[in-house]
Amino acid sequence: GKFNEDPALILDMGDYCIKDSRAMVAVAKQMRPMSDEEKLDWKVNERINDRGIKIDRELAQLAQQYADFEKEDLGERLALLTDGAVTAVTQSAKALTWFYFQVVNLDMGIPILECVTKVDKKTRERKRTFDKAARTAILALDCLTPVVREVVEIFDDGGSSSVAKFTAMLNRADPDTDRVHGCLVFAGAGQTKRYSSKGLQLQNFKRDCFSAEQTAILKELMRVGGDLRTDFNSASIMETLAKLLRPAIMPEVGHKFVVGDWSAIEARTLPWLSDSKGGESVLDIFRGGRDIYRETADAMGYEDRQIGKVAVLALGFGGAVGALQAMCKAYGIVMTDAEAQVVVDRWREANPWARVFWDALELASVKALRHPLTVYTVGRLRYVFVPKLLGGTLICILPDDSTIQYPYAKLRNGTVHCMKASVQPKADSNDAWPTMSLWGGILAQGATQAMAACLLREKLRECHTRRMSVIMHLHDEIVLEVPTQFRATYVAELQHVMETVPKWAEGLPLEAKPEVFDRYGK
């Protein structure tokens, strides 16, 4: 090919570049300059991106092939069950039409149609959807016929986005080194400045995964074209393949992974931020090396430790029955909504400091908007409203003096609302700029997650100074790729780095127990 040198197009391009430059100047004027520390953190993250992560190309290719074959089989089964009305797991619209005519005149029709119907909050328009939430709601019903249930299960199985990550791995991996570069985005998660991913979404890899030994067995089985259902006792091919995502990331020959993650980082950070007597009681459990999940269950009157675990993970930011049920599902716990409500009530009774903290945060945000440029302190957090910054910005100042910024903050019905999206829709767009309500639970969650991100940035900086080869990091996790003979040394060094409390976080008990892996795991 050759360049298009049409003079008119070149002039148009010049006009576009001028407008683009002016727009960037206008954006820059609205933003404060990055601090030296932020510039260093960005450089550290880019150095990690430059190292990249090595993938097992053969394993990813085999998994991709098996996923394609399974989708074909699922499509054939769908065609048989629906008399040809639906022939692929990608045909959600056809599935909705088929469902309607299957159930409209049956007792199960009303509950199913309620599951697949959503109401647009702005237009109040009723729309039908067959997304993950709708499928989960349908499968929870007791009135389904075997055929309807199987169709939903097929879509739930075949619609998994996890296996698509194998394609992303293969598309982004360097053909010579099999390493994927540039995945980690510095401060990509909006207000909290947590890291995010692009291309290959590392943050939402399935937690459940196979060990290196299981992966080797499964890889050899796929290499010879084995049947995973019979030879590997797999009930769901897609579920099995999803468990290969983490172990598809591997170290170079002669190297190991050293993986360290903080134990219950948010469950420690939240009470520490509250700077309360009740919060200190929770922190004392960690300081004493006791089991927070066991003690939480005991405090609520339950013998099952898992009940304590899901309560700690789901309820710290004001979550109620919905949040608890979502966490229960993730851990395979079944309870009714009534039982979940009892757990919520008991957790809040056992942790009154949390409710006090949520309410105090919400009150501070309201006071800040009513009294601009006045600082309000809650626990270890400070709030101030700056009316001339980005349409009026509520700022949360964290213990390390970094900030969370909530732009275009307004008081509405006694509650602070701010703009949610990073980019405002076009002027001719029908979409309004989405907003969010800054109630106490959201403020607590934002501060907790932002502080965890502060800790991670500081520890990545220290790893960089110590010349430790970080190849990947997630919200509470740091992954090193080290020579096999030095693995024990790096385990001890990474533990020291992660458990050393920064001066600005004095009193926060940190715990990390790095482990050695032949492949990336959990």
Q: How would you describe each model-predicted region?
A:
Residues 1-241, 254, 266, 325-402:
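Conserved "right-hand" nucleotidyltransferase catalytic core of DNA-directed polymerases
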Residues 20, 266, 289, 293, ...:
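Hydrophobic (often cysteine-bearing) scaffold residues that line and stabilize catalytic clefts
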Residues 31-41, 455-478:
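Active-site palm subdomain of RNA-directed nucleic acid polymerases
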Residues 96, 191-194, 203-209, 265-268, ...:
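Flexible loop/turn segments at secondary-structure boundaries
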Residues 123, 298-468, 509, 513-522:
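Conserved catalytic core of nucleic-acid polymerases
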Residues 154, 169-175, 187, 206-210, ...:
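Short, contiguous acidic/charged loop-to-helix segments that flank catalytic cores in large enzymes
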Residues 249-265:
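Conserved catalytic palm subdomain of right-hand nucleotidyl-transferase polymerases, strongest
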Residues 462-513:
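C-terminal structured "cap/appendage" subdomains that terminate the fold
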